[in-house]
Amino acid sequence: MACSAARPPADQDRFIFIYPAYLNNKKTIAEGRRIPISKAVENPTATEIQDVCSAVGLNAFLEKNKMYSREWNRDVQFRGRVRVQLKQEDGSLCLVQFPSRKSVMLYVAEMIPKLKTRTQKSGGADPILQQGEGSKKGKGKKKK
């Protein structure tokens, strides 16, 4: 087996992986969350992670059909992972602001709520929920 130090850091096998479960505030640490729950995001998707990484200038690839091993739900919403390049060919960092995988995860979790797809969803869903709350759900039996 080849030593990982022998391969160049820019080799695609040396990219870091970010699964949505790493950033999900609905997961426990045992279920795969890797950042503090106060900084985690509600149900992030691999596409959102890739959008944030690409926007900041990181080299990121989306792998849609990959699944996190601890994810029990096989739904399409929970599939995917993102490969992110941290180091260049010579071993130097691609971006100085991201020295580690944890710094990338914290930045992505901070930026996902600011995405246009997130802000539009939350604004449009509130009026629909408020309309349905006024109805009663049937009668109970009277006590004698």
UniProtKB/Swiss-Prot annotation:
Entry GO CC: nucleolus; nucleoplasm; signal recognition particle, endoplasmic reticulum targeting
Keyword Transport: no
Superkingdom per UniProt: Eukaryota
Compartments, as annotated in UniProt: Cytoplasm; Nucleus, Nucleolus; Nucleus, Nucleoplasm
Disulfide bridge partners, by residue number: none
Record family assignment: Belongs to the SRP19 family.
Name of the protein described by the UniProt record: Signal recognition particle 19 kDa protein
